[in-house]
Regions:
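Domain-level representation of secreted and single-pass membrane ectodomains enriched
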Residues: 1-166, 170-192
Length: 192
């Protein structure tokens, strides 16, 4: 945290930012290793000017670390968080420390970057556009455009994940259980 250029804001908080560039990238994702982050701190991710800003509060990062540990990860693997995809060849990570926190309390690194050759929106546009095989589906395939399947059709979602520095886009289905527990079950292909 000491090597950043910190600016003190009127409310006593401090903010600093660092940008990463990858020539030819359509989008980037930053792999952030948050080893120590003061309570109340906020990470912000954004691309080019006018791009939406995505915030990740320290509490959210702590919850993600616990989820990762519950899934069997430990150490740096549990602390690694992938930021959102930001359009363009540049991505900025901004850190805001709350009033009373010091940069010495921050241990943060960006050891990985995923260089996307197309944005997630561009990749999503290509899903399901192959019309050459219309009519070749098996008899067990159901046309969800039929009136009786409209509710089920709204349960399809996309998932973006990064593994080993490569970013993937998959689709899946949101599932409910018979207890209506509101547990967010997501069923996808094994390779996802």
């Amino acid at each position: 945290g000491r090597q950043w250029r910190w600016q003190r804001l009127a409310d006593g908080s401090q903010v600093a930012a660092i940008s990463f560039a990858a020539e030819g990238a359509q989008a980037l994702r930053l792999g952030v290793l948050a080893q120590e982050l003061p309570a109340g701190a906020v990470l912000r991710f954004y691309g080019a000017a006018g791009d939406k800003v995505v915030e990740m509060p320290a509490a959210e990062l702590a919850a993600l670390r616990l989820t990762n540990e519950a899934a069997g990860l430990s150490g740096d693997a549990a602390r690694m968080v992938w930021g959102p995809d930001t359009a363009g060849a540049q991505s900025t990570l901004e850190v805001q420390l709350p009033a009373g926190a010091t940069p010495e309390q921050l241990r943060l690194a960006v050891p990985q970057l995923s260089h996307l050759t197309q944005t997630v929106a561009q990749a999503s546009d290509g899903i399901g556009k192959n019309t050459a095989q219309i009519g070749d589906s098996g008899s067990c395939n159901v046309d969800i455009m039929c009136g009786s399947y409209q509710t089920e059709g709204r349960s399809v979602a996309k998932m973006v994940f990064t593994k080993g520095g490569s970013t993937y886009l998959c689709t899946g289905t949101l599932l409910n259980d018979t207890r209506n527990s509101q547990t967010p079950y997501f069923l996808s292909a094994a390779h996802c």
